[in-house]
């Protein structure tokens, strides 16, 4: 059974963190919790209690509800690069290929999302540079969703006219 959880759901002994040198990576602006959780999962056994033991308070002016900027997507993409590297380096189990596939898809998804937002922002010069440096990954990416595959193909096409048309259509769609 799949279980969704986040850092606020974990009870962790301080001794475990110190013995295994598990701390948040302060260089990551986003995704530091994911990086920490993945390293924690690799390092030790975990047990789940299938009950809600907390109450989530929704605050209207919370940062979690704020609009995402292009910088947010860039940091998120960078964080997933780092997570992929650290997990693949630390993991010693027998499911390395499966984990590689999942993390590669996740990394490609976040990178494609960042590039797509650069396209929608209209910074075609930056987009062209980023697509050039990620060309192979965009062409080979195995994203699960049709929309994400289509976006990766559009980005990998390096077709300036197509990029401008996509931006124009999306701007009109967002004005409705």
Where are these regions (language model features)?
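Hydrophobic alpha-helical core bundles mediating ligand binding, dimerization, or RNAP-core interactions
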Residues: 34-37, 80, 84, 107-111
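Inter-repeat boundary and helix-capping residues of tandem alpha-helical solenoids
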Residues: 30, 73, 101-104
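Conserved nucleotide-sugar donor-binding catalytic segment
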Residues: 1-70
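Short, surface-exposed acidic
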Residues: 92-102, 139-146
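Alpha-helix N-cap/helix-start motif at coil-to-helix transitions, marked by capping-box chemistry
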Residues: 6, 74-78, 105
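Membrane-interface aromatic/basic loop that binds lipid-linked glycans or pyrophosphate carriers
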Residues: 115-176
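Catalytic core of nucleotide-sugar-dependent glycosyltransferases
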Residues: 52-60, 66-95, 113-138
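Amphipathic alpha-helical repeat scaffolds of TPR domains
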Residues: 101-117
